[in-house]
């Protein structure tokens, strides 16, 4: 791991996360970071799998950062994501953004990429996440994300969307929580049925240096 990713790992257990989502984004409500936290919370709630979210955030003047971070944490907790399972890189020494090389390295560790953004003109980050073997969950209401996602075999959810030529509002029946939990189960089933993604996750969680030490070497020494 690079020094930057090691710093993230000192604040959050990256290797032990069964579901690890990385979302690089401006700290603005348009990027809908709270929806990432909510879906991650729902996934953990319906499965009891250790689910963690790392936001590689960089500043934006749209909303006070402390206020928006509190909103995101509150939303995550509401849907089932413990406070310790959510991290902003701006809180650990990267107030102007996490290095791009570090984001790419985190994508190599993660297995889930969620993009509920209001609007996107071209999903470069989606391509970067896909190229590093992440399961993609994209906002179907954003035309650019739908077009790209269809080519990449992404999983779609619907969130509010707004840009030139479209402005949509979503309603969820019976509730937004039920919507996330139902889709969370389906997302996990699809992730489990992807051999390459399953192998990537198992290598990180069960065959890291730490896992080998704790589960294979230390028992031999104690025995």
Q: For each of these PLM feature ranges, what is it?
A:
Residues 104, 122, 127-131, 145-146:
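Short alpha-helical segment that forms part of, or immediately flanks, the ligand-binding pocket
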Residues 1-13:
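A short helix/loop element that forms part of the nucleotide-sugar donor recognition site in Leloir-type
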Residues 66-105:
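Nucleotide-activated donor-binding/catalytic signature segment of Leloir-type glycosyltransferases, i.e.
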Residues 118:
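Aromatic "clamp/platform" in nucleotide-sugar-dependent glycosyltransferases that forms part
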Residues 135-139, 144-149, 157:
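Short hydrophobic beta-strand element within catalytic cores of glycosyltransferases
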Residues 111, 133-134:
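A short alpha->beta transition loop at the rim of the catalytic pocket in nucleotide-sugar-dependent
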Residues 170-221:
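A charged, aromatic-enriched C-terminal amphipathic alpha-helix characteristic of glycosyltransferases
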Residues 13-31, 37-40, 53-57:
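Conserved donor-binding/catalytic core segment of Leloir-type glycosyltransferases
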């Amino acid at each position: 791991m690079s020094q930057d990713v090691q710093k993230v790992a000192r604040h959050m257990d990256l290797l032990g996360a069964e579901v690890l989502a990385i979302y690089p984004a401006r700290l603005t409500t348009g990027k809908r970071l709270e929806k990432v936290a909510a879906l991650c919370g729902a996934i953990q709630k319906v499965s009891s799998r250790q689910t963690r979210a790392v936001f590689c955030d960089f500043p934006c003047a749209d909303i006070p950062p402390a206020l928006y971070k509190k909103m995101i944490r509150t939303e995550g907790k509401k849907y089932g994501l413990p406070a310790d399972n959510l991290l902003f890189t701006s809180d650990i020494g990267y107030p102007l953004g996490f290095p791009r090389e570090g984001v790419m390295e985190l994508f190599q560790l993660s297995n889930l990429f969620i993009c509920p953004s209001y609007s996107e003109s071209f999903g470069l980050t989606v391509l970067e996440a896909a190229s590093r073997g992440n399961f993609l969950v994209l906002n179907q209401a954003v035309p650019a994300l739908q077009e790209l996602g269809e080519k990449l075999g992404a999983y779609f959810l619907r969130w509010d969307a707004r840009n030139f030529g479209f402005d949509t509002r979503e309603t969820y029946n019976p509730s937004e929580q039920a919507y996330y939990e139902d889709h969370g189960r389906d997302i996990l089933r699809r992730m489990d049925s992807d051999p390459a993604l399953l192998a990537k996750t198992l290598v990180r969680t069960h065959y890291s240096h730490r896992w080998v030490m704790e589960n294979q070497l230390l028992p031999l020494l104690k025995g």
